[in-house]
Amino acid sequence: MNTDESARREAIATSRRWVVKIGSALATREGQGLNLEAIADWAAQIAEIRAGGREVLVVTSGAVAEGSARLGWRSRPASLNQLQAAAAIGQMGLVRGWELALRESGLLAAQILLTHEDIANRERYLNSRSTLLTLLQLGAVPVINENDTVATEEIKLGDNDTLAGMVSNLVDADLLIILTDQAGLMTADPRQDPDATLISCAPVDDAQLLAIAGGGGAWGRGGMRTKVTAARLAARSATSTIIASGRSPGVLRQIGAAQPVGTLLRAPATKLAARKQWLASTLHVRGSLRLDAGACTVLREQGKSLLAVGVTAVEGDFERGELVSCIGPDGQEVARGLANYSAAETLLVKGLPSSRFEERLGYLRDLELIHRDNLALV
């Protein structure tokens, strides 16, 4: 560990607010019921971290696996109804396991269940944030999971790595810890390449990280790729991420002692404004705008609003005020924001200067398709 990494880990170790994400492979016994001994150990470590003046939020998976075990199922169900039924049954055991473990360590647990709607709706987003911050002020440990019982494809977050990244944004966390069944992010899949080595530290926006990340296991929904994506999501609130093995004894204590465990993905020092964090965190867009190279440059380098003259194509069916994605000529997402005009209106004015809006539409509502205050780079 070099001097720069050592200094960064020491700063992170003493940071105030941590989000700890624990996946199904760790919270359960290979998908067959909860690993209560492991949960008790993490709870004891969290109590030590809390005693050092830090705040901790837990994002935990395992409800579907626990419910399946209680139902006698040997594999993850395929149908949505069965998944939701298993989640409903398993969530009872999951939250009780955490409640008892945290209580044994002298801590108060609080259950929070979220869906994408709670993030996408601005009012519910702010209310979720207020609730979480109030729980921290009261000294409780929020135990958070996706509400699989009611989530449909339209409102699913997708996996708890993504949820952990969003929670980090919600509460302006200093550190996101993603515990997994691997030592951290490797140079290659260690199950296929015996020469793979651990990446100790890297900037979260390193373009090579996603290229070397792999897939997930049978019970979890997220592989290493989703963990890197979650780290990038968390970085929007200047939250650094450590991906480490949850099976390493005392892993949270080691992180609290600035030990070189896992992979540290460094976030930039600057964070997005709160409103733009919310915009960037909303996963479900209603449509997309294809931009020319000039428009991409204006958005990325000058921080200006999106004008119709730089739009080459319109995709999807969206209304005024709905979220749209801005796609560059290379097919990569550049930004997302709230549309000032519907898809039908945008089709009529794409490629035109704002001075011709009234001619084509019969009215001029706004000069911009997306105002810079409602636009977030991704």
Residue ranges and their predicted role:
Residues 2-76, 80-108, 112-378:
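C-terminal catalytic "cap/lid" subdomain
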